[in-house]
């Protein structure tokens, strides 16, 4: 027998439930009505612990509230077990009040409530002293009630929720089941003291169970381990010495890329806007709205360079009350606009108007966010922009209007932006993966063959890979820190793999793949299995109330 003595239990009327988990990772349930002939049988009902958490207390007052569901944790699990410390918890508002299992459509809970005050026991009403209530509720209505004396359950030790037939166990005993199978959507224990409560969330796996006279005496889990793969494929746990071919369909969960270059530089496009003097521009005729706009340039997303080289022949005019530039919302000059500034929107226009008030009034009347004034010693042909000065003549100047909002869609630059992407070759070994090797994609089982790579002639992909007859990659090379490393791409499924059984135990695997840690054996490789997953026998009693982990 490959895996001796996982459990030995006799079930009289219920599913068996593991109550105290210890450090183990599995529990096995099956119905007492499941009485197959003697021998090995593939059967559901094994649950693997995938998450463990604890909770000290969740009652904020001096006591918890009995006869009600006050605390719940959300799950999406095949099974959830909630266990108290080994001594259990008292049926008292000073310690334990309510535990429940939520199967989405209905809730099963256990509680106590010996109180007659108004508002007490909202779900159950008064429960007799020294009794507990096991109930099921759907759409706020109770459809199942069972009152039990505490002599049967002196303390609360565990409540377990199982999707199979929506089974619920109190202290290891089946106390509720239905003809539906639903995952656990929520569960919880409302308590004040006596904890902590341990929550163990589980997923369902198949199991191969060995029955004698209707009793499961041994269990091998179909969990992807070597023992599980062999036993569940051959539907038995008894193997004589020899070689046993097997198949294992690989589920691809990982991807990796092998790059030709350790880094790649990408130069992003830089859009240039070049402005020039408008020699035949007409002066305004009074007011800022008569200032004509020229060479309007609006930036979209990306990188931009604004070329104002023609301004070298103009004289910048500082802001002086009504005179000159006006750009308090722009903390830059046009000479520095390309210094890596960020904008959400940006538009630039040229205009010719009075240096006296032209900029300030343009900003006040929302023609621009900022305005920069430049003198070219122009004639006094521009009209005023203030009421009472609309017919007066003033010196004409160049006005540069900037309309902008701050953000990160647009960046100004003096030079094109170069983005450097650093590539790291993290190669996943000894499992089936999706790969992209030098641009060639596929699925494979990657092994390191550096120690065996001698005098390979690399032809494809710049001398970096050998291709097989189909054009797929067979062997590829990667530059490592200490030299070249060679890797072989094998099919995910090895049709030649065999388990090796010796002395009735699974001791190794023969494979055609050179996996990490394998030993060459003629034209194959041998992988030694050092420790099989061995479990010791569980105790036997005439009336099983719980099946603790060993």
From Swiss-Prot:
One example of a Gene Ontology biological process annotation: virion attachment to host cell
Lineage, uppermost ranks: Viruses, Riboviria, Orthornavirae, Pisuviricota, Pisoniviricetes
Signal sequence residues: 1-18
Subunit description: Homotrimer; each monomer consists of a S1 and a S2 subunit. The resulting peplomers protrude from the virus surface as spikes.
Domain of life per record: Viruses
Sequence ranges on the Extracellular membrane side: 19-550
Keywords linked to the UniProt accession: Cleavage on pair of basic residues, Coiled coil, Fusion of virus membrane with host endosomal membrane, Fusion of virus membrane with host membrane, Glycoprotein, Host membrane, Host-virus interaction, Membrane, Signal, Viral attachment to host cell, Viral envelope protein, Viral penetration into host cytoplasm, Virion, Virulence, Virus endocytosis by host, Virus entry into host cell
Annotated site residue numbers, Cleavage: 538-539
Native source organism of the sequence: Avian infectious bronchitis virus (strain D3896) (IBV)
Keyword Glycoprotein: yes
Post-translational modification: Specific enzymatic cleavages in vivo yield mature proteins. The precursor is processed into S1 and S2 by host cell furin or furin-like protease to yield the mature S1 and S2 proteins. The cleavage site between S1 and S2 requires the optimal sequence [KR]-X-[KR]-R. Cleavage is not necessary for virus-cell fusion.
Segments traversing the membrane: none
Described function: S1 attaches the virion to the cell membrane by interacting with cell receptors, initiating the infection. S2 is a class I viral fusion protein. Under the current model, the protein has at least 3 conformational states: pre-fusion native state, pre-hairpin intermediate state, and post-fusion hairpin state. During viral and target cell membrane fusion, the coiled coil regions (heptad repeats) assume a trimer-of-hairpins structure, positioning the fusion peptide in close proximity to the C-terminal region of the ectodomain. The formation of this structure appears to drive apposition and subsequent fusion of viral and target cell membranes.
Disulfide partners: none
One GO CC term, this protein: virion membrane
Residues glycosylated per entry: 23, 74, 102, 139, 145, 164, 179, 213, 238, 248, 265, 272, 277, 307, 426, 448, 514, 531, 543
Family matches, as InterPro entries: CoV_S1_C (IPR043607)
Protein name, entry field: Spike glycoprotein
UniProt record similarity statement: Belongs to the coronaviruses spike protein family.
